[in-house]
């Protein structure tokens, strides 16, 4: 990213940070928007000073109080965080017009001022050439990295597609097994219903046969009783018949005797 604009969430002041990574010299950058230590919301130093209550800063966005805020400093490949007390922010100066930050920095930090006006004129071409070479080198590196990334992504995509095909095959097999099991389950249900109907029919037939058997048993008992009575009656008749036969024989003998006597 070549540059970025940051905005205070309260007063909406804008700060722009430009990236100098293409230039061969080191660049020191202080990120102007400050971060509340507790809730991590970002404000400018003036808003922190104005909304501060004693030693604490109540965040106007989430109402969480912070005792400190963080300042981030970037130097080449190192990022430092400076933890500052909220009570340490104080107004240094104020004028009617806007400050020229560059002029103010040249006065405040005079001992650290680097005068590169002559170097800019003498080394303009070298700087442009260095920037162009750095841009070309970075583009080559980016292209190589992107190519490797594309190859890796393609390999990952192929692997993912193979995995997807394998999973689809497994899913189709699971669906087929499920359909077969469902079909078998339906068949078992039909067999169970048929068996239950047959069992019910057998139970009904058994109940009918049991009822008929009980009726026949009752009738057989009645017939048995009648048969006993008939046997008794037969025996009685047999005895009477025997008695009659005996009486008949006696009678016949008596008659024969009487006839014989009369003849004589």
UniProtKB/Swiss-Prot annotation:
It comes from the Viruses. It is found in: Host nucleus. SUPFAM superfamilies: RING/U-box. Coiled coil: none annotated. This is Zinc finger protein CG30. GO terms for molecular function: zinc ion binding. Keywords: Host nucleus, Metal-binding, Zinc, Zinc-finger. Plays a role in the proper expression of late and very late genes. One of its GO terms (cellular component) is host cell nucleus. A zinc finger (RING-type) spans 8-63. InterPro entries: Znf_C3HC4_RING-type, Znf_RING, Znf_RING/FYVE/PHD, Znf_RING_CS.
């Amino acid at each position: 990213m070549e540059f970025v604009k940051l905005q205070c969430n309260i007063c909406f002041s804008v700060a722009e940070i430009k990236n100098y990574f293409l230039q061969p010299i080191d660049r020191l950058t202080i990120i102007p928007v400050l971060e509340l230590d507790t809730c991590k919301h970002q404000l400018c130093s003036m808003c922190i000073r104005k909304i501060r209550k004693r030693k604490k800063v109540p965040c106007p966005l989430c109402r969480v109080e912070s005792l400190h805020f963080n300042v981030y400093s970037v130097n080449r490949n190192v990022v430092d965080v400076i933890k500052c007390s909220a009570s340490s922010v104080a107004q240094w100066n104020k004028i009617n017009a806007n400050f020229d930050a560059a002029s103010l920095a040249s006065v405040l930090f005079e001992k650290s001022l680097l005068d590169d006006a002559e170097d800019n004129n003498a080394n303009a071409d070298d700087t442009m050439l260095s920037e162009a070479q750095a841009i070309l080198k970075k583009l080559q590196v980016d292209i190589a990295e992107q190519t490797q990334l594309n190859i890796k992504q393609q390999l990952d995509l192929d692997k993912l597609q193979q995995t997807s095909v394998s999973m689809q095959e497994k899913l189709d097999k699971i669906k087929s097994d499920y359909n077969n099991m469902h079909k078998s389950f339906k068949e078992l249900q039909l067999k169970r219903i048929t068996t239950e109907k047959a069992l019910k029919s057998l139970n009904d037939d058994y109940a009918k046969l049991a009822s008929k058997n009980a009726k026949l048993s009752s009738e057989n008992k009645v017939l048995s009783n009648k048969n006993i009575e008939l046997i008794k009656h037969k025996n009685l008749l047999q005895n009477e018949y025997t008695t009659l036969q005996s009486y008949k024989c006696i009678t016949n003998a008596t008659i024969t005797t009487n006839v014989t006597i009369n003849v004589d």
